[in-house]
């Protein structure tokens, strides 16, 4: 009705992780409407135990994004809604960089990890989108190589202080092909 193409949600909603049954109708409606969902970290876990060095923003935010991705995957949200368009801000946080560990845990302890979804978590990399703001050219290259150039889009984190000061500089620094940049 409003012509909006998508919405932004936090990495969790209050005390609910993104696999909470109370949130499924929201994700289902977004999927049916073809609306995109940007997941941005907030209210970082462990904040009380990290009072110094801006640690909630430096290490808590990446962990929040991994938490969100794992809940969407392990909770079966992405399995039940294969057309759901989800983009994880900050390059997916630590999720793409720990997918090997996550997959290993899935394979070694399915009794704990695969309780609500028996599908390998790595399979969902092709279903998720990631923004490009990772603050490191090598990390961006890894993200592109791991998730695919068609799954990574420009991200700046504007207007927050950790955002990319020159939008697109990270992508431009990689000397990607014109086709990859266009994606």
Model-derived segments and spans:
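Alpha-helical packing segments of well-folded alpha/beta enzyme cores
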Residues: 1, 26, 69-73, 80, ...
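Active-site gating/metal-coordination segments in enzymes
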Residues: 1-76
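A cross-domain feature marking catalytic cores of carbohydrate-active enzymes
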Residues: 6-13, 39-41, 88-90, 132-134, ...
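Distinct, well-ordered alpha-helical segments
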Residues: 1, 19-23, 99-103, 139-144
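Aromatic-lined glycan-binding groove of carbohydrate-active enzymes
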Residues: 76, 82-123
């Amino acid at each position: 009705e409003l012509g909006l193409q998508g919405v932004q949600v936090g990495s969790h909603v209050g005390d609910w992780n993104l696999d909470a049954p109370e949130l499924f109708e929201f994700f289902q409606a977004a999927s049916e409407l073809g609306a995109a969902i940007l997941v941005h970290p907030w209210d970082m876990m462990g904040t009380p135990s990290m009072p110094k060095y801006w640690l909630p923003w430096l290490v808590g935010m990446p962990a929040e994004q991994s938490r969100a991705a794992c809940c969407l995957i392990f909770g079966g949200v992405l399995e039940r809604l294969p057309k759901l368009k989800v983009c994880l801000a900050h390059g997916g946080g630590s999720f793409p960089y720990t997918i090997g560990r996550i997959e290993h845990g899935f394979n070694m302890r399915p009794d704990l990890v695969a309780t609500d979804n028996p599908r390998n978590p790595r399979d969902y990399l092709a279903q998720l989108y990631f923004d490009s703001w990772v603050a490191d050219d090598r990390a961006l290259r890894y993200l592109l190589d791991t998730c695919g150039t068609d799954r990574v889009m420009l991200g700046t984190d504007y207007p927050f202080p950790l955002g990319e000061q020159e939008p697109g500089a990270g992508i431009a620094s990689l000397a990607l092909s014109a086709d990859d940049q266009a994606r």
